[in-house]
C-alpha cells in the first residue's frame, strides 16, 4: 500500500440535541473544522486535490453539496473537486477511506477528509405535498428518526441492539456498567483538558453575544443506580435504555492527508500514516456486530494482530453492541475508548468516524503509543475499520 499520511486535523466540540450547536448549519460546522485542519497542517487550500465529507441528514438544500461549500468557504479553490459520502454511521470514516483511495491512485497529492452533522436541525418532510392528496390527513416524516431506523424493517436501531444483546448474552447490568465507564472516562478527559488541543471553537450565539463553544456538552453526571433505574426504550422487557445508548448530536471534524512523497517534497512533517482499512456486511437486524468482521478483514489485509493496537476507538452506538464487539474481537477494555465514547460524548452520525480518528491520533501521541484502530458499526448491517500508526 502506498504510504498515505495524516498531516493534522481538528474537530469541533460535540453539541447535544437542541443544544449549543442547534443554530449552526452542518456546512458552517464543516467549514470551521476544515479551516482549522488546513491551518494546523501547514497546507494551503490550493494544494488540496480532493475533498470528501461524510454527511447523512440534509438539513437544507445546500447540504446536498456540503463538501463543496465547506471546502470553498475554507479557502479551497473552485478548481478542486469535492463530494459528500453517506455510509450512515460510518460516513466520516468512509470519507477518510475515500481520500486514501484517491491519494493511492495518484488522483491527488493532498486531500481533505471529514464529516459534519447537525442532527438538531433534521427536517420533517411531507411526502404527499408535491402532488397533493385527494382527501384525508397528510403525514409528516421525521428524517432524523428515519435515519435511525433499519431500512429492512427491523425498526429503530435500538431494536438491533436488543437483538445483539440477546445473541451475545449481554446483560443489562453489563450495559449499564459500560455506560458508566464511558461517562467516567469522558468526564476525566474533559477535566484533564485532553480534548482541548483537538477542538477548534465554534462561535455560537448566547443571548446577545457570540461566544466560543469549545467543550463537549453531552456527558452527564450519573450513577450506576440512576442508570439502572431507567426504563427500556425499545422492548418492554429489554435492556437498552437512553442511558446505555449513544446520543443524538451535532459536530464536525476534518483531517488533511497526503501522499508521503508529496508531504516530504513540501517539507511537511506528518503525524501518522494509514496502515489499512476494511469493510464488512452483516445481517441488518444485528448491525451492531459489524465491526467484528470489518476488523477481522483489516487484520487479514495488513497482517496486524489485535494486540498491536495501543488505542482502539470502537464507536459506542449502544453499550450492547460495543460489548459484543469487545467480546468478539477479544479487545482489552483498558485500550478501548480510553477517554469515553459515544454514550458519553455523543454520536453526530455523519461526523463521528472523523471525530474518533482525531481522538485516536491525539491519544496515541499523548501516551506515546504506536498503532491505533478506529471501527464502527453501520445501520443497515455493515462495519468499517481503519488502522493508523504515529510517526
PLM regions: where:
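Active-site pocket-lining segment
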Residues: 160-162, 195-198, 205-206, 275-344
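N-terminal extracellular/periplasmic Venus flytrap/periplasmic-binding protein-like
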Residues: 11-12, 23-32, 174-261, 265, ...
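Active-site-proximal alpha-helical scaffold in enzymes
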Residues: 87-117, 165-194, 254-261, 326, ...
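Condensing-enzyme catalytic core mediating Claisen C-C bond formation in acyl metabolism
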Residues: 1-24, 36, 224-289, 293, ...
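Conserved catalytic cysteine-centered active-site region
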Residues: 24, 55-110, 151-157, 221-247, ...
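Flexible glycine-/small-residue-enriched beta->alpha junction loops
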Residues: 109-163
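Conserved active-site "lid/cap" helical segment
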Residues: 1-56, 60-70, 74, 81, ...
Amino acid at each position: 500500500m502506498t504510504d498515505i499520511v495524516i498531516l493534522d486535523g481538528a474537530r469541533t466540540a460535540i453539541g447535544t440535541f437542541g443544544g449549543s450547536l442547534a443554530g449552526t448549519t452542518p456546512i458552517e460546522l464543516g467549514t470551521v473544522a476544515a479551516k482549522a485542519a488546513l491551518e494546523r497542517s501547514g497546507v494551503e487550500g490550493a494544494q488540496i486535490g480532493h475533498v470528501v465529507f461524510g454527511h447523512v441528514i440534509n438539513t437544507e438544500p445546500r447540504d446536498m453539496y456540503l463538501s463543496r461549500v465547506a471546502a470553498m468557504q475554507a479557502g479551497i479553490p473552485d478548481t478542486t473537486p469535492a463530494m459528500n459520502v453517506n455510509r450512515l454511521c460510518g460516513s466520516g470514516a468512509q470519507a477518510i477511506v475515500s481520500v486514501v483511495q484517491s491519494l493511492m491512485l495518484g488522483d491527488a497529492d493532498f486531500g481533505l477528509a471529514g464529516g459534519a452533522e447537525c442532527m438538531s436541525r433534521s427536517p420533517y418532510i411531507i411526502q404527499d405535498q408535491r402532488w397533493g392528496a385527494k382527501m384525508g390527513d397528510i403525514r409528516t416524516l421525521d428524517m432524523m428518526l428515519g435515519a435511525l431506523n433499519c431500512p429492512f424493517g427491523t425498526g429503530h436501531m435500538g431494536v438491533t441492539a436488543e437483538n445483539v444483546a440477546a445473541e451475545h448474552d449481554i446483560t443489562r447490568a453489563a450495559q449499564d456498567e459500560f455506560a458508566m465507564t464511558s461517562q467516567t472516562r469522558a468526564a476525566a478527559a474533559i477535566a484533564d483538558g485532553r480534548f482541548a488541543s483537538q477542538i477548534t471553537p465554534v462561535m455560537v450565539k448566547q443571548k446577545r453575544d457570540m461566544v466560543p463553544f469549545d467543550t463537549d456538552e453531552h456527558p452527564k453526571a450519573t450513577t450506576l443506580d440512576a442508570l439502572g433505574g431507567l426504563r427500556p426504550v425499545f422492548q418492554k422487557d429489554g435492556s437498552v435504555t437512553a442511558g446505555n445508548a449513544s446520543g443524538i448530536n451535532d459536530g464536525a471534524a476534518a483531517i488533511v492527508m497526503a501522499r508521503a512523497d508529496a508531504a516530504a517534497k513540501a517539507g511537511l512533517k506528518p503525524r501518522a500514516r494509514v496502515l489499512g482499512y476494511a469493510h464488512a456486511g452483516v445481517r441488518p437486524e444485528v448491525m451492531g456486530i459489524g465491526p467484528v468482521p470489518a476488523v477481522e478483514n483489516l487484520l487479514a489485509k495488513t497482517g496486524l494482530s489485535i494486540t498491536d493496537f495501543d488505542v482502539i476507538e470502537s464507536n459506542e452506538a449502544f453499550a450492547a453492541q460495543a460489548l459484543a464487539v469487545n467480546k468478539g474481537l477479544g479487545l482489552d477494555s483498558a485500550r478501548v475508548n480510553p477517554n469515553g465514547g459515544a454514550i458519553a460524548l455523543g454520536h453526530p452520525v455523519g461526523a463521528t468516524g472523523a471525530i474518533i480518528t482525531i481522538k485516536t491520533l491525539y491519544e496515541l501521541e499523548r501516551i506515546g503509543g504506536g498503532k491505533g484502530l478506529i471501527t464502527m458499526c453501520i445501520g443497515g448491517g455493515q462495519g468499517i475499520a481503519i488502522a493508523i500508526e504515529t510517526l
